[in-house]
Amino acid sequence: MAFSVSPSVIVREVDASASVPAIATPPAAIAGVFRWGPVGEAILLSSENELVNRYGSPDDTNYETFFTAADYLSYSNALYVARVDNGATHADTYTRVTANNVTTTTDTSGAFKGLYPGELGNSLEVAYVRSEAYEGVIVEMGEDGTSNIPTNKITGNTDLTHTIAFNSANVSFEVSKANKLPIADIDIDDVFVIGNNSVGYQNIPVASIAEVARNAGGTVETDDALIAAYSYDITFNGKYTLPETSLNKLKIDRKWAWSGLFAKKPQDGNYHIAVIDQDGSVSGTADSVLELYTDVSTTTSAKLSSGKTNYYKDIITQESAWVQVANTAHFEANTSTSSYESLAGATAGRTESDATLADLAGGYDLFKSANEIDVSFVLQGKGDSAGNLATYIISNVADYRKDCIAFISPASSDVVDESKTEKMLSNVIDYRNSLPSSSYSVIDSGYKYRYDRYNDVYRYTPLNGDVAGLASRVEPYESPAGFRKGVIKNVVKLAFNPNKAQRDQLYSNEVNPVMSQVGQGIVLFGDKTGLGQNSAFDRINVRRLFIAVEKSIANAAQSFLFELNDEFTQAQFKGIVEPFLRDIQGRRGIVDFRVISDATVNTPAVIDQGKFRANIFIKPARSINNIELTFVATRSGVEFEEIVGSLT
């Protein structure tokens, strides 16, 4: 407190409102192989749709990892996902087919590359056009009045012959020196709009442009420059299907293939950009539009009226989920033609079955520090038969942090690939025995059979995402198992459905059985941790209760750092902890408790060392694992009071 010599009013404020924060369930975490998304970065997701949008839909290379994450998100709404580095590469080369002096070429140095590594990048096309190349009239024919256009072909004046064979995909242009068509302005995938007001108009995309070494008179052209610039055939992706009738006028316009997605052409010098899913691997539908960027500028200082940048590179860097700018000079050089760059060169890398322990460990290490990311559960996803990944997660993440639980499933080869339940049982027990004993782990009995709507197939996927999801739906001091709270979602059947004798064996080895029962569904039928000894911490609810209580009280205790260790501080600490524990007791999570933080533990020696000590004793509530029902038949004349209490 400040002192004053002369008369004055000193204001002092004391905060006596400190309390222990309420118990909350932090997000879960998983690392694994995904088809798309950032590598080596933990992203918080809240739904399966976000999972698909950020990391792509599953395929045969990663469905176990994907559905572990998706299944957890069907119970909860907070999951950190980390994509591991499995050796996948970016789509950083391009197939850009252009009509440059009527030669079809391939350009492997394009303006864009895939934003993330992975084969999905090969499905992307980036189409862009500057205002000058957005649209234009190719030719108008039949206007000179010399003759009508016959039904089998369309012919212009003597300097230009443009032939369309009805119901054919081939169109032939023949051009002499006197009438030069701007071939340099035409690009593969541009759209020709052919027709007139009488018969209507038809859009036909350009498929290829090839050189024709002749002029309008039918003689061979010897001037290479003229051949290259003005003599060509065009083939379309589609047939000319307008009415087969004589026409006295026909107009052909060229336009950018994706012009229909924009209200108008870009302002002078600006560009429209479209990111397209060419083969449907991203969206499920070929040629789906993923992203549009309207009227963007190549000027680095360009701004919109709102003050937001209009520089194309900055916009794509900030907003695109699919591409990044790789070569600004290449992009800005395309001023007079439209461009369609098909991304290529990406590789998928190692699958979830081939991923090394080093690959996966690198992802799970992102969750190793309790000070950086707060998580409650760590999901294993796909397991390996040797238990190496599970051991790493238990030992180096869960046991290391001591504030989260690892959820583990056996390998698919232990149950899915076996036909006899006796062998499945021994495999699962052997798998569990290969893992370390820890109260920070929970082990289930296997795999479930579920529907994969993304590929229209049924697949076996691990149950650790479901078991963790069940735990996320109950209070930390409650068991997630049983017919009320332990019903598994999104399941057709189990790979291993243990009977009573097999469940006894599994439970004796700290494996929580998941079983199917007629009329009840498929349920989690155990709530043990992976601790291989008799202890209060061999139950999920007790371990979770202590994690929650320890984290909450530890967070509250931070405010006492650098305070004076006297009776007032000791009583104040007890005063904020006891109401917190009393609230949990009132909700049936604790049977009894006691907090000791007085001079009996804060001795002068402890105080002189700059320490503060508090002992917190807790009697946790226990879940029911066995129910014994005794039915007693008595004689008619016997009073119940005579025998009640005599039975044990």
For each of these PLM feature ranges, what is it?
Residues 1-97, 110-115, 193-196, 277, ...:
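Structured, hydrophobic secondary-structure cores that serve as assembly/anchoring elements
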Residues 97-113, 119, 127-241:
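Autoprocessing Asn-cyclization modules and mimics
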Residues 99-105, 126, 253-264, 364-368:
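Intrinsically disordered, low-complexity regulatory segments in eukaryotic proteins
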Residues 106-108, 122, 228-232, 267-269, ...:
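Residues at beta-strand starts and edge strands
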Residues 134-137, 255, 259-261, 298-302, ...:
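Short, cationic low-complexity segments
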Residues 237-252, 279-299:
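Acidic, small/polar residue-enriched beta-strand/turn segments
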Residues 287-322:
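E2/UBC-UEV (E2-variant) core
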